[in-house]
């Protein structure tokens, strides 16, 4: 098969990927949707419980083992100063349910599927014992960069820098990236705009920031059309910055649309928003693009799921965004999953009994999260019954 080359001349990066995706026989729609009811079910690969033929665990059982946690942050990250999540225990270990508060139930249900898969289904096969990770630099003032980087253990090989923060300017971003390059002259740098720029702003910013030898820019703009136009503009101007899609994968009705449109050079994949390791693996395989595995500001329990996904992939061309435990004041585990010299070991993570008590959320927060789990479980159960029936019919040739 003829392949397209992804080039970054300044860094000597050459990446190849298939120009045409593998044939998709079933639309990859979101598994749960309050707008489409029972008919909108898993597509290419259903949730792990469907593909494994395993019933969803009973809601009462989930709630009885759920621990709602409240963990402070070292720095403000996406406007968050305290991270709340729910840890769920099952026969195969622990899972973490940590969708951000603003996510609606239809979106949060994917995260519950991922947590339940980690706790109630056997782990998938892995091919490595450790995974490369990047450190993450929030949108802090330039003078704080050295202090934040000191929170990481050992040498930092790759660093993701947050940019396009609301209320900040391009000058702030340039100063932050420059400070990072000064502190880490040999590290691979990449930026994440979280779709915070318009198309003109993104072109201006990436042209300026390319002087710092960026590996790639993650989600600089919000739409697929703007991503395609931005890639074309950068190519025409010979600006050597690759484009990665994140929100266009994890928040899209069809996470493969951005790949089919050739709007990105690589994709950033998080297990939880896609419903778990099994479904996320399918998205990567179908996309035909290099993948970066990332996390969503979770404790070591959630990070372990992302690490497992990364360890199951045959290739990891870039450092994974799985080093965010270092941004927490503490962790639920006494042996947190943090990077040492840019690598994290592949192993399960479990909370320490004492920390389940000391880090427990207050009554109001606990009640809010448990009610959210109930609503999401009902969405999952409704989708599971329909998907399980269709999955069975397809297996019988109907």
Each model region followed by its residue ranges:
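N-terminal leader/targeting signatures
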Residues: 2, 24-25, 45
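Polybasic, lysine-rich low-complexity intrinsically disordered segments
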Residues: 2-10
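N-terminal capping/lid subdomain adjacent to the active-site entrance of alpha/beta enzymes
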Residues: 28, 35, 40-190, 194-212, ...
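Catalytic core of soluble alpha/beta enzymes
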Residues: 166-308, 330-331
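Short helix/strand-capping turn motifs
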Residues: 317-324
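C-terminal helical cap(s) of enzyme catalytic domains, especially alpha/beta-barrels
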Residues: 286, 305, 313, 330-344
């Amino acid at each position: 098969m003829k392949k397209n080359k992804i080039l970054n001349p300044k860094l000597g990066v050459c990446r190849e990927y298939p120009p045409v995706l593998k044939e998709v026989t079933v639309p990859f729609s979101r598994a749960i949707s309050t707008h489409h009811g029972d008919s909108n079910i898993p597509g290419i690969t259903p949730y792990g419980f469907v593909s494994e033929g395993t019933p969803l665990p009973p809601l009462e059982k989930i709630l009885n083992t759920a621990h709602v946690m409240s963990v402070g942050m070292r720095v403000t990250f996406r406007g968050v100063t305290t991270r709340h999540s729910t840890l769920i225990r099952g026969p195969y270990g622990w899972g973490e349910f940590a969708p951000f508060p603003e996510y609606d139930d239809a979106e949060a249900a994917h995260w519950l599927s991922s947590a339940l898969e980690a706790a109630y289904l056997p782990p998938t096969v892995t091919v490595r014992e450790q995974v490369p990770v990047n450190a993450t630099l929030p949108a802090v003032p330039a003078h704080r960069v050295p202090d934040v980087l000191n929170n990481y253990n050992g040498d930092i090989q790759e660093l993701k820098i947050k940019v396009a923060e609301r209320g900040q300017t391009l000058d702030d971003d340039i100063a932050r990236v420059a400070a990072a390059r000064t502190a880490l002259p040999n590290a691979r740098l990449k930026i994440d705009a979280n779709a915070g720029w318009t198309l003109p702003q993104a072109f201006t910013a990436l042209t300026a920031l390319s002087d710092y030898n960026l590996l790639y820019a993650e989600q600089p703009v919000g739409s697929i059309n703007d991503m395609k136009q931005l890639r074309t503009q950068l190519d025409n101007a010979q600006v050597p910055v690759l484009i990665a899609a994140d929100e266009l994968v994890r928040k899209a009705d069809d996470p493969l649309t951005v790949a089919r449109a050739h709007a990105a050079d690589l994709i950033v994949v998080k297990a939880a928003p896609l419903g778990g390791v099994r479904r996320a693996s399918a998205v990567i395989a179908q996309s035909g693009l290099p993948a970066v595995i990332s996390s969503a500001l979770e404790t070591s329990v959630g990070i372990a799921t992302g690490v497992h996904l990364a360890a199951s992939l045959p290739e990891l061309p870039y450092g994974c965004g799985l080093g965010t435990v270092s941004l927490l004041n503490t962790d639920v585990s006494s042996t947190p999953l943090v990077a040492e010299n840019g690598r994290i070991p592949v192993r399960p993570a479990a909370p320490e009994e004492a920390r389940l008590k000391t880090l427990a959320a207050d009554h109001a927060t606990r009640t809010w999260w448990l009610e959210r789990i109930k609503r999401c479980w009902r969405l999952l159960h409704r989708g599971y019954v329909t998907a399980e029936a269709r999955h069975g019919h397809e297996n019988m040739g109907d």
